[in-house]
C-alpha cells in the first residue's frame, strides 16, 4: 500500500484528534468507533453480536483516518471501546479475543500508514499501576495488554503509545510512587515499550511524574490544563508552582531518551467543576508553539476539546503552513 507523504525534514508541531469526529458522527448512518452494548445484551445476544459491533467500529476507523488525512490531521487517538467488553471479566477469553480480528487489525495498520496516522490510546482512569489491590492491578495489566496488543497487531511503530495517569495515592504518595515503579518494572515488555505517563490535577503533579520517570525511564506527557488545575487545588505544594515553561526541557528529555516523538496535551477550562474541558481552545500557548524552533524537536499536541476536529481546524491559523 502506497504511503502518502506528510512528513517534514525540519522540526514541526502537529495537532492531534481524540477518538471522535463530530462531522462524521452526525452523518446518517453515523461514522464512529465506539459502538458497544450493556452486559445484559452481550449475555443475551452472544459473542457474534459484539464481534459484529467491533468490525463496524474498525470499518469506520478507516473512514475517520481518511478524513483526517484529507484535512491535514496526522495524529489520532483511538477509542478504547473498539472491541465491546473484550476486557470484561465475565467474558470467556478463550472464545472472544483479539485473535478474532487478526486480518482486520493488520489492514487497519496498513490504512494508518497509508494516511500517515500516528496512532495512540488513552486507557481509562481505572487503570491504576500504583494500586495496593492485587485484583485491581491484575485487571489493569490485562487492560494495558489488550491496548498494546492492538497496536502490535496493527504493526504500529514505537511512536504509538498508551497514555495513563498515576491513579490514586492511597493515603501515602511516596509509597504509591515506589509501588508504581515496582509494578511497572514487572510489566511485560510489549506494555512497557508503549506506556507513557501523564500528570493529573488531583494526585500526581508534573514534578511527581518526572520523579517517576527518573526512576524507570518512562516518557512524560505534559497536560497544560491538568498542570494549572493541580496548582489551584494544591496551593501548598511548592514544587507544583514552578513555571510550566521551566518544565518543557525536562519533559522533552524523557522522550528524547526513548527515541519517541513527544506528545503534549492541550485543553482549557470549560463550564462546571475544575478540570472540565471547553468546547474550543482559544490559543496554542507560546511555550508549545516554540518547541520545534527552540529545542529542535518535532512535537504532537493532542487537542482535548469537546468539539474535536472543529477545534483543531479553528486553531490552524495559529500554526505555520508546514505543520499541516
Residues covered by each model-derived region:
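Eukaryote-skewed repeat-based solenoidal scaffolds used as protein-protein interaction platforms
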Residues: 144-216, 225
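Short active-site loop/helix that positions an aromatic residue
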Residues: 228-232
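Glycine-rich, often proline-containing surface loops adjacent to acidic residues and nearby aromatics
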Residues: 118-127, 159-165
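Conserved, mostly hydrophobic/aromatic
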Residues: 122, 223, 301
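Alpha/beta catalytic barrel-like cores
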Residues: 1-118, 127-141, 145-156, 186, ...
Amino acid at each position: 500500500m502506497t504511503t502518502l507523504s506528510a512528513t517534514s525534514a525540519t522540526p514541526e508541531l502537529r495537532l492531534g484528534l481524540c477518538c471522535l469526529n463530530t462531522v462524521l458522527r452526525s452523518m446518517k448512518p453515523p461514522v464512529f468507533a465506539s459502538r458497544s452494548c450493556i452486559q445484559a445484551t452481550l449475555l443475551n445476544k452472544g459473542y457474534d453480536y459484539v464481534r459484529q459491533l467491533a468490525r463496524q467500529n474498525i470499518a469506520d476507523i478507516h473512514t475517520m483516518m481518511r478524513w483526517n488525512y484529507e484535512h491535514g490531521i496526522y495524529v489520532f487517538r483511538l477509542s478504547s471501546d473498539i472491541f465491546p467488553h473484550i476486557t470484561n471479566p465475565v467474558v470467556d477469553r478463550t472464545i472472544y479475543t483479539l485473535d478474532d480480528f487478526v486480518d482486520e487489525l493488520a489492514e487497519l495498520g496498513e490504512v494508518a500508514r497509508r494516511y500517515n496516522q500516528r496512532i495512540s490510546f488513552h486507557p481509562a482512569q481505572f487503570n491504576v499501576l500504583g494500586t495496593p489491590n492485587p485484583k485491581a492491578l491484575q485487571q489493569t495489566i490485562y487492560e494495558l495488554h489488550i491496548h498494546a496488543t492492538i497496536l502490535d497487531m496493527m504493526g504500529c511503530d514505537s511512536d504509538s503509545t498508551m497514555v495513563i495517569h498515576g491513579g490514586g495515592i492511597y493515603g501515602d504518595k511516596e509509597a504509591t510512587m515506589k509501588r508504581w515503579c515496582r509494578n511497572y518494572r514487572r510489566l511485560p515488555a510489549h506494555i512497557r515499550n508503549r506506556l507513557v505517563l501523564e500528570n493529573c490535577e488531583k494526585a500526581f503533579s508534573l514534578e511527581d511524574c518526572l520523579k517517576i520517570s527518573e526512576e524507570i525511564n518512562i516518557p512524560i506527557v505534559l497536560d497544560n490544563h491538568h498542570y494549572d488545575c493541580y496548582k489551584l487545588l494544591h496551593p501548598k505544594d511548592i514544587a507544583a508552582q514552578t513555571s510550566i515553561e521551566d518544565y518543557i526541557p525536562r519533559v522533552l528529555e524523557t522522550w528524547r531518551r526513548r527515541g519517541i516523538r513527544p506528545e503534549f496535551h492541550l485543553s482549557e477550562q470549560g463550564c462546571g467543576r475544575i478540570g472540565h474541558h471547553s468546547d474550543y481552545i482559544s490559543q496554542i500557548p507560546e511555550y508549545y508553539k516554540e518547541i520545534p524552533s527552540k529545542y529542535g524537536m518535532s512535537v504532537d499536541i493532542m487537542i482535548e476539546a469537546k468539539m474535536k476536529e472543529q477545534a483543531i481546524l479553528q486553531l490552524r491559523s495559529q500554526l505555520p503552513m508546514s505543520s499541516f
